Amino acid sequence: MIRSIIRGVGSALPKRSLSNDELAKFVETSDAWIVQRTGIHQRYIANENETTVSLGVKAAQAALINAGLTIKDIDCIILATSTPNRTFPASAVEIQYALGMNHGFAFDIQAVCSGFIFALTTGDSYLRCGAAKRILVIGSDTFSRILDWEDRTTCVLFGDGAGAAVLEAEEIEGGIAFQRGILSAKLRSDGAYIDKLYVDGGPSTTQTTGYLRMEGREVFKYAVGMITDVVDDCFAAAGMDSSQLDWFVPHQANKRIIEASAKKLKISSDKVVITVDKHGNTSAASVPLALTTALCDGRIKRGDLIMLEAMGGGFTWGAILIRW
């Protein structure tokens, strides 16, 4: 049986960090107000020379080094982003070129904050059917470009960044208890909630980019239930439950949502990876940034059972269960 394993991970952040106190100098807010409601202390903001593509390239290079591979070993690049460098071609193709890859194929996936989960699941499907041997999966976003910096309910939440993972096909023998890699994945979407979290513009409507708009309370109201339901489905598909979990790596949107979801799933706080305090919500980069952090600091070890999850505009949401 073919399983998809994550052979290497990497991340990249812009050079400039922006603390809550610095933000309060030009936005009507305060460190206390932001921390109490979100758990965020700072975020990273891209400068004019830092883009979704440039951050994605750096994260990809770090993941390749971590995996002990070169770009010649990669068959496909999948980029999850909602903030591409251009309307077209795909930013994944720009990353492919920047990495010196002129073989295989590359494309973008747009599922907002759920993007990395959707991209990783797509890559897993390619590996299982034999369409590729190794895939570079990247989540990269520069949400600072689409924020209304006069709207304190949204501009305090988001940051820029990128994360990447090298997904590799591996032949596995034995039952699920002896297997590693992606054990199960579940994806969901429902367009009935489009107006809860969106960008008010686009090439086909306004011919402009627009700004991010969000009904925060409404998103929170739905988020916890949707996240926990899809996580439970993911556990069930693998014949497991939350009591067996070693690490919960959620989308870093808001500390309140993370804590409420973990509590409902009966996952103790010491098993939850939280980086939202340092990065803010980096959209598609959120999960791979958190995963890379927990791997680099030694928390996640070989054999650990890990649940990744995310929810984003649309709504889109999903979860992936992995044996490391």
Curated annotation (Swiss-Prot):
Reactions that this protein is recorded to catalyse: malonyl-[ACP] + acetyl-CoA + H(+) = 3-oxobutanoyl-[ACP] + CO2 + CoA
Sorted UniProt keywords: Acyltransferase, Cytoplasm, Fatty acid biosynthesis, Fatty acid metabolism, Lipid biosynthesis, Lipid metabolism, Multifunctional enzyme, Transferase
Source species, domain of life: Bacteria
EC number: 2.3.1.180
Gene Ontology CC: one annotated term: cytoplasm
Renumbered residue ranges of the record's region ACP-binding: 252-256
Assembly, per entry: Homodimer.
Role this protein plays: Catalyzes the condensation reaction of fatty acid synthesis by the addition to an acyl acceptor of two carbons from malonyl-ACP. Catalyzes the first condensation reaction which initiates fatty acid synthesis and may therefore play a role in governing the total rate of fatty acid production. Possesses both acetoacetyl-ACP synthase and acetyl transacylase activities. Its substrate specificity determines the biosynthesis of branched-chain and/or straight-chain of fatty acids.
Designated name of the protein: Beta-ketoacyl-[acyl-carrier-protein] synthase III
Organism: Bartonella tribocorum (strain CIP 105476 / IBS 506)
